[in-house]
Every structure is written in structure tokens, then in C-alpha cells.
């Protein structure tokens, strides 16, 4: 680091994190068909874990000049932290990948706790390119890139597919809403325990 310029060091961290995410995707994909899945469930704080995921992806977010905000009260849920971190990493990666150039890219993590229903949700919203309404029903399908695939060569159609598979393993319900040119929100609904 001493012999590198700050710009080269920042770019090197960006490439390192990008490679790490690709390797994680490959490893999670290879585990999909496993008969026995090694999942340790424990109490985790949602926003604290979101902050850890942001820290793990900080070079990607800084390179794209993202602002990150958090709202709501931190809530305990029972989940597998490693799997939840993977989900968050993929969502962050997509937000960076589909950020609109020449804007102030932003991502927000918002926790809602409904005491009446016992439902705890995490909404992760960005102000990126958004997803066409015609593509929304297919974004969790394996290999689906939609319109994004035609203009972004890095699109593999695997990120949200793996997010959906991991969420299913963790009993987290997923919803996605998006408006073209306005951004995307992914909502994670944690099981009641």
C-alpha cells in the first residue's frame, strides 16, 4: 500500500471485492443441490448485519460514490448470518451495478417491526435504473437478465436467483417492487418465531 497511489489502492480493493463476490456466487450455486445444508440459526440484529454487509462491500460503494442510510429500530431475528450476509451482498452488488451514471446513487436499509402481526421486514431501496414492469415477474428466474442484459455485459441473471434460493432456505419471504428510472426495493419478510 505504501508504494501505491491512493487511486490504485482504491481500484485494487474494488477489484478484490468484485472477485470475492463472484467466487461467493459460484460457491453458493454449487451448494444449491446439496442434500444437507449446513445452516446455523442464531439471533442476529438486522441493521447491524446490514452495516457489516456495507462494510464488506465498501470499496464497491465508494467507487460508485454511494450514500448509505439506515432507518427504523434494529430488531433481532433468528436466521443464518452467513446466508443473510450473502443476500445483502448480492442486493448491494445489484444496486451498484445498476446505478444511474451522473446521479447521486443511494441505498437505504429500512427495518419495520409490526408488533400486531409479529412481522419484521427489511426493505432495501436504491435509486438506480429500475426494472421494467414486464421484467419484474422473472427477475428471480435462473439466468434472466431482461433488458439489463442487452446493455450491461456484466449481467449474469444469477444474483437474484441465488438471493431467492438462499431466502427460501432461511424461510425469508421476498418481494420486489421497481419503477423504471426511479429505482428498486427488495423487501425481506422474516419468519415469526
Give the location of each predicted region:
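Short alpha-helical segment of the dimerization/phosphotransfer core of two-component systems
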Residues: 14-19
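Conserved micro-motifs of the catalytic ATP-binding
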Residues: 34-39, 76-80
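Short conserved segments within the C-terminal catalytic ATPase subdomain
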Residues: 60-70
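Short helix-loop "hinge" at the ATP-lid/N-box region of the Bergerat-fold HATPase_c
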Residues: 95-99
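Acidic ATP/Mg2+-coordinating residue in the GHKL
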Residues: 126
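Short conserved segment of the HATPase_c
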Residues: 131-143
Amino acid at each position: 500500500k505504501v508504494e501505491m497511489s491512493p487511486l490504485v489502492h482504491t481500484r485494487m480493493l474494488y477489484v478484490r471485492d468484485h472477485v470475492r463476490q463472484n467466487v461467493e456466487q459460484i460457491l453458493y450455486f454449487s451448494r444449491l443441490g446439496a442434500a444437507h445444508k449446513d445452516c446455523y440459526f442464531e439471533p442476529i440484529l438486522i441493521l447491524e448485519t446490514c452495516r457489516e454487509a456495507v462494510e464488506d462491500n465498501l470499496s464497491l460503494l465508494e467507487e460508485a460514490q454511494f450514500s448509505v442510510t439506515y432507518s427504523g429500530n434494529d430488531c433481532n431475528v433468528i436466521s443464518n448470518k452467513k446466508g443473510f450476509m450473502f443476500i445483502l451482498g448480492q442486493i448491494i452488488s445489484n444496486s451498484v451495478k445498476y446505478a444511474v451514471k451522473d446521479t447521486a446513487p443511494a441505498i437505504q436499509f429500512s427495518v419495520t417491526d409490526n408488533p400486531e402481526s409479529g412481522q419484521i421486514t427489511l426493505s432495501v431501496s436504491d435509486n438506480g435504473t429500475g426494472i421494467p414492469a414486464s421484467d419484474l415477474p422473472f427477475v428471480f428466474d435462473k439466468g434472466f437478465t431482461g433488458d439489463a442484459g442487452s446493455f450491461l455485459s456484466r449481467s449474469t441473471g444469477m444474483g437474484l436467483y441465488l438471493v431467492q434460493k438462499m431466502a427460501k432456505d432461511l424461510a425469508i419471504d421476498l418481494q420486489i417492487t421497481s419503477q423504471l428510472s426511479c429505482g428498486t426495493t427488495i423487501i425481506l419478510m422474516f419468519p415469526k418465531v
